[in-house]
Amino acid sequence: MNTVVSLFKNNSDIDNLRDSGYGSAAFEVIKTPMYFRTADGSSKEVANKDMYFRADTGDQLAVHSSKYKMVTHQSMIDTARKVLERSQLNLKDIKETIAVGDSGGVCFVRHQLPNHQIETPDGDTAIMELLHINSHTSVWPYQATAGANQNACTNHQVFLGEIAAIYKARHTQSLDVDRGANLMNKIMGVMDEQNNIWGRWKNTNVGLKEAVRHIATATGSKVALDLLDKDEDFSSIMEVPAVYNNSSFMYVMAKYMGHYQKKMGSNYWAVYNALTDWATHHTGTRSNTIDLPISQVKRSEKIQQTIRNFSIAS
């Protein structure tokens, strides 16, 4: 009897994930030539164009050139698991969450690593969280980023862009798995580095108008920004319909003033937590259903851009 012994210490933890399958990404993608209907009612093939759609639902995912090489979400998930398996990270009790957005056109895989944990500046704990993204629509390249999940509020904590990025590739086929694992190993010190920044944010006071400016920037409230530039007072700004009808802006302001500012003080740490609360939990007020997985990532990217402008205490 031949016994195969894995060379990777994380093999059993990753095998447990493999046994769980691909979740909502477990669907086949079919490619077909693209046609258009002519004036006389006949069909004609569009040169060098293919359409991709889900075999189970028929939803169209993307249109690409005939030379395009589609990478399935299952392939991305396999690659992410292989990278983690070869890394030196402690994967005991790892939790994997698979979600798709845009009717299946985009896939997000989050891995939470409870054995990589820190204490945040306000005494909460946060565990390392890794995010892998694959897109059939070319909205995002295949990428992996680091973040954290705060235990008390379950916010997905966004890291500064230069700290968060692990690797990007046009396709999973372009990524050397062993190189990816080596890059993954470098994030073991990332949480401490980011936590030091969080500590400086907690020690940096922020005025109300400055907090409003950062919140308006992240949530796209251009009217609020214009009024701030005109030195309008806070109460007047909040009475403008174009401001209070922005549900994202109002959500963050309510979270900041009603919870995080009271709990953490008037500082950048409180502003940051209000923003990550919005990125993680806000579902909007429109009647149409929000695509939460895509929304969470897009909001996180906006937060990354905003926090670059935080003035940090020395």
Identify the function of each model-found stretch.
Residues 1-79:
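Feature for intrinsically disordered/low-complexity regulatory segments and propeptides
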Residues 79, 85-314:
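Intrinsic disorder/low-complexity polar-acidic segments
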